[in-house]
UniProtKB/Swiss-Prot annotation:
Domain KH: residue ranges: 215-300
Species in which this protein is naturally found: Chlorobium phaeobacteroides (strain DSM 266 / SMG 266 / 2430)
SMART domains according to UniProt: HDc, KH
GO molecular function terms attached to this record: RNA binding; RNA endonuclease activity
Name of the protein in its database record: Ribonuclease Y
Keyword Metal-binding: no
Free-text function comment from the UniProt entry: Endoribonuclease that initiates mRNA decay.
Length: 525
């Protein structure tokens, strides 16, 4: 019993000692662990702060770099703008100096003319004094002659006076005739000098680049592989393209180039736009060709209107009707003696306007009449001369009588009724007289021959379109499939060929091709 109690006490004491020791030992380890955690947290905090500072510094450097780059960019733009402004200022300063020099020269010329006039006035006064002296001397001599005549011939004073007057009148008439002739010669010389000065001033103040129009357009392609797609299976794409546009398409060995050939610049430009659209889409077949052609026609209408608006804007011609503006733009695709008709009309307008300014006439009216003088060339075919057709067309838009007369008279079809008409005619002659202009008459004659071939074929019933191809060696006729049968197509080809033989002179032979196509369309609903 006593041993058990002692053992129990020992166990309790051991437990108390173990518990107390464990408590202090645990507290010790907890304090150590807490201290370690705190140190780690502090180190982590320091690390986070350092990383944040590093990121902040990097962000700051990035933003500073961006700001510096933006500042440098703005600085470069500012420097460039300053250079441009300085160049413009220097150019304007040069122009001002030139104008100042011109004004000084004109002022000096005026002073010289004033001195000359003063000298001439003095000479005239001296001449008048001499004339008065001679008149007095003449009266004295006349009196002496009268006295001598009376004493010698026993004539009455009135009779002698009449004889003397007749002699003096005859001599005066002779001198007056010589003076009038001299005045006429001087007036003609002054008029020639003034006209020469006016023309030289006008010509020197304008400059136009002119090039003879040819019948070819070049379309660049990305690779020669596209040529096969342009040709199509058994050439069907080329045939569809030529039928739609009326333009020859030439695919040869020239790398990355396709050539379009046609005498009509407008038709050739339409074909060029059509081919470019097909190349962009990458899909080439007959239906796509027709769609691209229709899209090109809409686009060319916008181009024509833009060309007309740009022309009247550059010439500062106000209040031009929209229909007339469209015809002016259409001049871009016509030629006259090898010159582009729009460029020719602009050149004539500039010349006429400058000459009108030199002669103190209305420059705006002169430019308006000159720009419109060849508008008859872009009107539908007419039996009237193009000058008369242009005048009659412009009458519908209430153009002024001066403009109408200048348009109608520039080829001598009617009498010129104003100085403006003379200026327009002169400017037209100057423009067409440039070196090489008249050398293109043969080309224009060729175009007329091709147009006559197309007109002959169009005169037959059932014909939709006609195209003269291969420099006039082939006339391709597209007919209505529903109205012209196969047998009628053969007869039509024969009739067209016979009419061409009787009305057109040409070397070699002309092939007449009739194309008859019939389409059946149905819609599934």
């Amino acid at each position: 019993m006593g041993i058990f109690f002692i053992s129990l006490v020992l166990i309790v004491l051991a437990s108390v000692v173990f518990f107390v020791g464990g408590f202090f030992l645990g507290r010790y380890f907890l304090e150590r662990i807490g201290t370690t955690k705190i140190l780690e947290a502090e180190e982590r905090a320091v690390q986070i702060v350092q990383e944040a500072q590093k990121e902040a510094n990097e962000y700051k450097e990035l933003k500073v770099s961006e700001v510096n780059q933006e500042w440098k960019k703005k600085r470069r733009e500012f420097d460039q703008e300053v250079v441009i402004k300085n160049n413009k200022f220097n150019q304007m300063q040069k122009q001002v100096l030139q104008k100042e020099g011109q004004l000084k020269k004109q002022s000096q010329d005026l002073r010289d003319m004033e001195r000359k006039l003063q000298d001439q006035r003095k000479e005239i006064e001296q001449t008048m004094e001499t004339v008065n002296l001679r008149s007095s001397e003449l009266e004295r001599i006349t009196l002496e002659q009268n006295q001598r005549l009376e004493s010698i011939s026993n004539l009455q004073a009135d009779e002698a006076r009449q004889m003397l007057v007749d002699n003096m009148l005859a001599k005066a008439r002779e001198e007056a005739t010589e003076t009038i002739h001299q005045i006429h010669e001087e007036a003609e010389q002054q008029a020639e000098r003034l006209a020469e000065k006016t023309l030289l001033t006008a010509i020197q103040r304008i400059s136009f680049e002119q090039a003879t129009e040819n019948a070819l357009s070049v379309v660049h392609i990305q690779s020669d592989e596209l040529k096969g797609r342009i040709i199509g299976r058994e050439g069907r794409n080329i045939k569809a393209f030529e039928n739609a546009t009326g333009v020859d398409i030439i695919v040869d060995d020239t790398p990355e180039v396709v050539i379009l050939s046609c005498f009509d610049p407008l038709r050739r430009e339409l074909a060029k736009l059509t081919l470019q659209k097909l190349l962009v889409d990458g899909i080439i077949h007959p239906v796509a060709i027709e769609k691209a052609y229709e899209d090109a026609k809409k686009e060319i209408d916008d181009v024509i209107m833009s060309a007309g608006e740009e022309t009247i804007s550059s010439l500062q011609i106000p209040d031009m009707p929209a229909e007339v503006v469209g015809l002016i733009g259409k001049m871009k695709y016509h030629t006259v003696y090898g010159q582009n008709l729009l460029q020719h009309s602009r050149e004539v307008a500039m010349l006429a306007g400058l000459m009108a300014s030199e002669l103190k006439l209305d420059a705006r009216v002169a430019k308006r009449a000159a720009l419109l003088h060849d508008i008859g060339l872009v009107l539908p075919e007419s039996d009237e001369p193009h000058a008369i057709a242009g005048r009659n067309f412009l009458k519908k838009f209430n153009e002024s009588a001066v403009v109408l007369n200048a348009v109608a008279a520039h080829h001598g079809d009617v009498v010129k009724e104003s100085p403006i008409a003379e200026l327009v005619d002169a400017a037209n002659v100057i423009s067409l007289s440039r070196p090489g202009a008249r050398g293109a008459v043969t080309a224009d004659g060729n175009v007329k021959r091709l147009e006559s071939l197309e007109e002959i074929a169009k005169g037959f019933p059932g014909v939709l379109k006609t195209y003269a191809l291969q420099a006039g060696r082939e006339i391709r006729v597209i007919v209505e499939g529903d109205n012209v049968s196969d047998s009628q197509a053969d007869v039509l080809a024969h009739d067209i060929a016979r009419k061409i033989e009787s009305e057109v002179q040409y070397p070699g032979q002309i092939k007449v091709s009739i194309i008859r196509e019939r389409r059946s369309i149905a819609y599934a609903k």
